[in-house]
């Protein structure tokens, strides 16, 4: 078990890469903090981890919320006493995306079927506010999670 005794905080842990990472890290011995904006999905990941004998807890976290990120770090420290690993898997590919909302994603893509024939149209027609929302989640979310968690990681060595 390569992560025995380590504490891993994983944003976007409710599905996709975040969920897979949480499950794998737990199998490797880590205690896992699953953070996600969709509570039900985050709780499902915790259930998957604990059913396999791992240790996990859930905390609600909107990746672009400074206060949510600090609450996430505080939760990890309260629950497990340290933060050793941070994985920022929270991310989206389009502004209409909401983690776990497959129906909304399908509707979003259905409106853009014609773009798949000429992908340049998506770029040329992309609304700047939509682009900024995607970048905020994907990039700002990583920065905010690091700002919240890295001080504890440095402190614990």
Where are these regions (language model features)?
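Canonical Rossmann dinucleotide-binding motif of NAD(H)/NADP(H)-dependent dehydrogenases/reductases
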Residues: 2-33
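A glycine-rich helix->loop->beta "capping" turn
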Residues: 52-55, 75-86, 94, 119-127
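Catalytic Tyr-X3-Lys loop
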Residues: 103-143
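Rossmann-fold scaffold of SDR-type NAD(P)-dependent oxidoreductases
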Residues: 11-12, 83-91, 99, 107-117, ...
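A short, exposed helix-loop element centered on a Lys and neighboring polar residues
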Residues: 146-147
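Active-site loop of short-chain dehydrogenase/reductase
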Residues: 6, 54-55, 82-83, 104-119, ...
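The beta1-alpha1 cofactor-binding region of Rossmann-like NAD(H)/NADP(H)-dependent oxidoreductases
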Residues: 39-40, 60-72, 128
